[in-house]
Amino acid sequence: MATRHQVRQSIVSLLYAAQLNQENKDFINEFLDEKKIRNDQRKFTLDLYNGINEQLALLDEKINECLKEHKLDGVASIEKAILRLGAYEILFTSTQKAIIINEAIELAKEMAGDNAPKFINGVLDKINKEVQ
């Protein structure tokens, strides 16, 4: 069974693929099967993924409000996916905010550039402070 961290890695990968116009239902199901994401974890994955897509405009607006030098369009695709996942979880789930931000930082360390963890931490921390 996949861990929550592995589920989040998969969501970031799916969001990244969607940005590259490679999203379709068959791809999503095959991807989740390949990653052995089943049952409750599959539901958790799809709930987060679909929720992010449903709230994409709001998430991008919130993220843009927290960016100093550039807007989301100038952010690398993988970092954008991590930010969207983190922002969605902060705004729409009951998961502890410290866990959400820590997970996003870990995803950035694993999947993004050297400066990404600090950048993602800063943006998500601002979003978190706004909703408290």
Swiss-Prot record:
GO terms for molecular function: RNA binding. It comes from the Bacteria. Disulfide bonds: none annotated. GO terms for cellular component: cytosol. Keywords: RNA-binding, Transcription, Transcription antitermination, Transcription regulation. Pfam families: NusB. SUPFAM superfamilies: NusB-like. GO terms for biological process: DNA-templated transcription termination; transcription antitermination. Involved in transcription antitermination. Required for transcription of ribosomal RNA (rRNA) genes. Binds specifically to the boxA antiterminator sequence of the ribosomal RNA (rrn) operons. PANTHER family: ANTITERMINATION NUSB DOMAIN-CONTAINING PROTEIN (PTHR11078:SF3), N UTILIZATION SUBSTANCE PROTEIN B-RELATED (PTHR11078). Belongs to the NusB family. This is Transcription antitermination protein NusB. It comes from Campylobacter lari (strain RM2100 / D67 / ATCC BAA-1060). The lineage of its organism: Bacteria, Pseudomonadati, Campylobacterota, Epsilonproteobacteria, Campylobacterales. The gene is nusB.
